[in-house]
């Protein structure tokens, strides 16, 4: 519930200009030309608290407990949870001010279709999470403004880094980034269990035999042989060990594939896989255990595994390459503006009162 309910908040760095169910104080001051309502501040704070809870080791900790706990940020800095929330709340507001200024400077306006999309998303969100947001002082106008900023950011980003933007990212730069940051390669998946017959016992000796087959395959590929050339025989032998029937055409197609994994996707594959591929050089092959399977993974440059056009159809490469830096640039721009936030007004809204679930 916590992560779902905060999705609209996190994607916009949590800021808005209007709308709040709490009336005193009505605003908390301004950064640059952006004035923040109480609702916008509470939204920024709510997002910051959610970020804090993701860093706390104890998943059962309450917000008040988390605020008193030391946490380590993604940058490796250790600080009290309360300090982290205050810092992130301010950064969220600075980002919003920086974004507003950049939109004004480029005279960016949302289209009618985008405005209709904002209305639809706002209505859906309020139907699903309106009660929770209301308990946190976040009203419909605030949520609407959050979606407006999200779409405005997308439009601004395209104006800067899109194909027709101010600083378009070349295909060569995209390819270089993929080869440096994505994990890509050829995969042969060998079974360690028999999912077709749960009554069939796969012994430890059987698993060791499959592991030996996997290592033999990896050694052959490292020795210069092609994974495609040895895949059929290796997979057939592994199926036989675990008592599975093998069809060369269908089973080979299902278990021999190629992957390109973006940095943000690595955690999905598990820590064992992430640690194994981290130091695996391009051109080398290793055996990696994943659940009830073994991967014979041969690492290759991403540009050799899939065409750039195919990857662009599935990923917003420009956002992957420049999105984080661009967001930080907007935050830094906001931080450099005149800050007229009212600390006493902000102190009226305690982070310890944030509710994460209804």
Predicted feature locations:
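Hydrophobic/aromatic residues in well-formed alpha-helices
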Residues: 41, 115-118, 143, 174, ...
């Amino acid at each position: 519930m916590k992560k779902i309910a905060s999705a609209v908040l996190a994607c916009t760095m949590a800021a808005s200009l209007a709308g709040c169910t709490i009336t005193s104080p009505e605003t908390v001051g301004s950064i640059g030309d952006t004035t923040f309502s109480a609702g916008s501040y509470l939204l920024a704070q709510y997002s910051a608290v959610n970020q804090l809870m993701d860093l706390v080791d104890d998943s059962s900790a309450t917000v008040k407990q988390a605020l008193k706990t030391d946490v380590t940020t993604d940058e490796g800095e250790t600080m009290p949870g309360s300090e982290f929330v205050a810092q992130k709340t301010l950064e969220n507001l600075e980002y919003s001010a920086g974004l507003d200024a950049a939109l004004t400077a480029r005279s960016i306006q949302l289209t009618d279709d985008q405005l209709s999309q904002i209305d639809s998303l706002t209505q859906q969100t309020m139907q699903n999470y309106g009660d929770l947001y209301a308990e946190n002082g976040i009203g419909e106008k605030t949520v609407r403004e959050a979606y407006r900023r999200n779409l405005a950011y997308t439009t601004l980003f395209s104006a800067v880094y899109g194909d027709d933007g101010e600083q378009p990212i070349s295909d060569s730069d995209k390819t270089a980034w993929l080869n440096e940051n994505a994990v890509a390669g050829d995969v042969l998946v060998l079974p360690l269990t028999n999912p077709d017959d749960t009554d069939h016992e796969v012994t430890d000796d059987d698993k060791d035999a499959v592991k030996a087959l996997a290592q033999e395959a990896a050694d052959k590929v490292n020795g210069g042989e092609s994974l495609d050339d040895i895949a059929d025989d290796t997979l057939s032998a592994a199926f036989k060990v675990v008592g599975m029937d093998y069809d060369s055409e269908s089973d080979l197609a299902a278990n021999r594939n190629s992957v390109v994994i973006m940095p943000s996707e690595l955690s999905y594959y598990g820590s064992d896989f992430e640690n194994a591929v981290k130091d695996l050089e391009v051109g080398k092959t290793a055996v990696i255990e994943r659940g009830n399977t073994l991967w014979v993974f041969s690492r290759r440059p991403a540009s050799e595994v899939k065409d750039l056009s195919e990857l662009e159809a599935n990923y917003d490469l420009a956002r992957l390459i420049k999105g984080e830096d661009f967001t930080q640039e907007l935050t830094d721009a906001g931080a450099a503006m005149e800050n007229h936030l009212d600390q006493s007004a902000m102190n009226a809204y305690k982070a310890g009162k944030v509710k994460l679930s209804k």
